[in-house]
Amino acid sequence: MKDVSKNQEENISDTALTNELIHLLGHSRHDWMNKLQLIKGNLSLQKYDRVFEMIEEMVIDAKHESKLSNLKTPHLAFDFLTFNWKTHYMTLEYEVLGEIKDLSAYDQKLAKLMRKLFHLFDQAVSRESENHLTVSLQTDHPDRQLILYLDFHGAFADPSAFDDIRQNGYEDVDIMRFEITSHECLIEIGLD
């Protein structure tokens, strides 16, 4: 009887995973269709320079997505790749600066840190403005395994959401820089 129950659990788990994968592929397909529609629209308007710019942006985004996916940080990569598909009060852009390296030892820590920061940004930003966060992951720093740069542009409704992390830090990461104004925020975090 245990074997039957275990097989049922595995089938349910496989089905749930398959459904989630199909759901994620649907989001990805939707993103690509939007980009293709923009290219098609610009072609019909004979804005060829803009078409070439868009294609170049798509290539750059795909390269960063590939580098992120190859850092061996599946939880972090999942959060970044799916961020803009979820309800947030800002858009996310990311880039990997430097060579691909194995950061698997940092995956859980990075995912937890970024989820915390995303939550704080969602609490702090104005819901009436266009908000944009760029996260750069520098893998080739001479003194650190990784440096995260967060560069926010938009508007804050409640910047005090960051007070605790600014004053007390966060677990065992080194917050090297934290500057905030009513419309910008720069954060630099080092991991050894």
Swiss-Prot record:
It is an enzyme of class 2 (transferase). One of its GO terms (cellular component) is cytoplasm. It is found in: Cytoplasm. Phosphorylated by spo0F. One of its GO terms (biological process) is sporulation resulting in formation of a cellular spore. It comes from the Bacteria. One of its GO terms (molecular function) is phosphorelay sensor kinase activity. Changing residue 30 to A: Loss of sporulation. InterPro entries: Sig_transdc_His_kin_SpoOB, Spo0B_C_sf, SPOB_a, SpoOB_C. Homodimer. Dimerization is essential for activity as both monomers contribute to the formation of the active site. Key element in the phosphorelay regulating sporulation initiation. Acts on spo0A. Mediates reversible phosphoryl transfer from spo0F to spo0A. This is Sporulation initiation phosphotransferase B. The gene is spo0B.
